[in-house]
Amino acid sequence: MGIKGLTGLLNEHAPNSIKEHDIKTLFGRKVAIDASMSIYQFLIAVRQRDGEMLTNDAGETTSHLMGFFYRTIRIVENGIKPAYVFDGKPPELKKGVLSKRFEKREEAKEEGEEAKEIGTAEDVDRFSRRTVKVTKQHNEECQKLLRLMGVPCVIAPSEAEAQCAELARGGKVYAAGSEDMDTLTFNAPILFRHLTFSEAKKQPISEINLEAALKGLDMDMSQFVDLCILLGCDYLEPIKGVGPKSALKLIREFGGLKEVVEHLREKAAARKAEAEEEDEEEAEEPAPTSDVEMPDDEDGEKDSDDEEEAERRKKAEAAKKKKAQEKAKSAKKGKGKGKGGIQIPDEWPWEEAKQIFLKPDVIPADQVELEWKNPDVEGLVQFLVTEKGFSEERVRKGAEKLTKFLNAKQQGRLDGFFTVKPKQAPPPAAKGKGAASKGTKRKGEDKAEGSGKKAKKK
């Protein structure tokens, strides 16, 4: 899921933190790519014309393998050295989110079956994409493929994005590659997005610089993590009523999430007390009565007064009913917000979520060795062609490209040799009567020059 609304905030408040590149400009870079996110992307995007996933003759899914093989070759052809990082065991705090995702997939399956009966082809395609689940077999097959290709793989102890960030921070790679913005929350100094997108999309690579983002938002790393949690992350139920703008405003106003939570809980308690007081006042309101009791001997005036009293009661009851309906409607509309405000869920362990971001379970970068090797051509043919039904000609051509580019001596980047120095200001011009103005000559200079030239001719 990543961090909701973070990209929009950076575009608005820290535009200098985001740059766009053509993939060709990234030659010479090493990148740690979130493989688990890539598998999910390929299972959704790499499909047949009818919208179904690619399969071999045995009915086995091959979309993920097709995606990894050809997208990795494209990356390598452009002079980039990828290393893929796979998810390990998810944090305990994430289990609730994973459970909800499972429920949504089951709902999508049921809706997909119904769409097959009465829906359009677009409906069927949409629901089938929502049912995608990355399995253990998908992971194992992708790891096997990448090793045969000579591309390094790392199995993270927990979150792949956190391990990518660690490798970038430790200098093993230049950047982390993922679509999840929480890679920045894990303190990745540089994040590449859209690196594994299809070339047909013509989507430029987006580079996000964490230091520039913090500077633009005017906050430190701890506050940035607080902001990301408040925006909505993978570990906590989002707070209804808090959008990107209000989240940024709250963190800036109160300085941190601890103070924000205390403030919101106090406001929620005050609103609750106020609502209870209003309910008590309404319950104590006396039924409307006539102000004047008319005597019985006023020639039928008593009957007229009774009718007026009944009308007043009727109007009062109608007004009370309308007020109750408006109150119920308002409560329904602001459900979870506490009478039009923001209300934090009772169980909202943000401190635990913050610790996951600040101290993630990762392998230290200095304990990881990334090595790019020659591809095992015959191994690739056996796995992709014999077992998975790929075209042998295409597999061998792809292997040739891997051999050529993975083993080629990488051309150094100019930004690795040169340091950009600030432009020096020109020396100050002499001041006073004796100073000659730039682009002008003193009287007599033209004459002297002219006579000098004439003398030379002689």
UniProtKB/Swiss-Prot annotation:
Transmembrane segments: none
A Pfam family that the UniProt record links to this protein: XPG_I
Keywords: DNA damage, DNA repair, DNA replication, Endonuclease, Exonuclease, Hydrolase, Magnesium, Metal-binding, Mitochondrion, Nuclease, Nucleus, Phosphoprotein
EC identifiers of the protein: 3.1.-.-
Acidic residues bias spans: 275-285, 293-309
Cofactor requirement: Mg(2+)
Positions that bind DNA: 47, 71, 159, 232, 234
Region described as I-domain: 123-254
Mod. after translation: Phosphorylated. Phosphorylation upon DNA damage induces relocalization to the nuclear plasma.
Biased composition (Basic and acidic residues): 310-329, 442-452
BP term (GO), one: DNA replication, removal of RNA primer
Cofactor note: Binds 2 magnesium ions per subunit. They probably participate in the reaction catalyzed by the enzyme. May bind an additional third magnesium ion after substrate binding.
Residues that hold Mg(2+) 1 according to the record: 34, 87, 159, 161
Binding site for Mg(2+) 2: 180, 182, 234
PROSITE patterns reported in the protein's UniProt record: XPG_1 (PS00841), XPG_2 (PS00842)
Segments for region (Interaction with PCNA): 410-418
Keyword Ubl conjugation assigned: no
Top-level taxon of the source organism: Eukaryota
Keyword Ribosomal protein: no
GO cellular component: mitochondrion; nucleolus; nucleoplasm
Top EC class for this record: hydrolase
Subunit structure: Interacts with PCNA. Three molecules of FEN1 bind to one PCNA trimer with each molecule binding to one PCNA monomer. PCNA stimulates the nuclease activity without altering cleavage specificity.
Family: Belongs to the XPG/RAD2 endonuclease family. FEN1 subfamily.
Summary of the function given for this chain in its UniProt record: Structure-specific nuclease with 5'-flap endonuclease and 5'-3' exonuclease activities involved in DNA replication and repair. During DNA replication, cleaves the 5'-overhanging flap structure that is generated by displacement synthesis when DNA polymerase encounters the 5'-end of a downstream Okazaki fragment. It enters the flap from the 5'-end and then tracks to cleave the flap base, leaving a nick for ligation. Also involved in the long patch base excision repair (LP-BER) pathway, by cleaving within the apurinic/apyrimidinic (AP) site-terminated flap.
Protein name from the UniProt record: Flap endonuclease 1
Species annotation: Coprinopsis cinerea (strain Okayama-7 / 130 / ATCC MYA-4618 / FGSC 9003) (Inky cap fungus)
Upper taxonomic lineage: Eukaryota, Fungi, Dikarya, Basidiomycota, Agaricomycotina
Gene that encodes it: FEN1
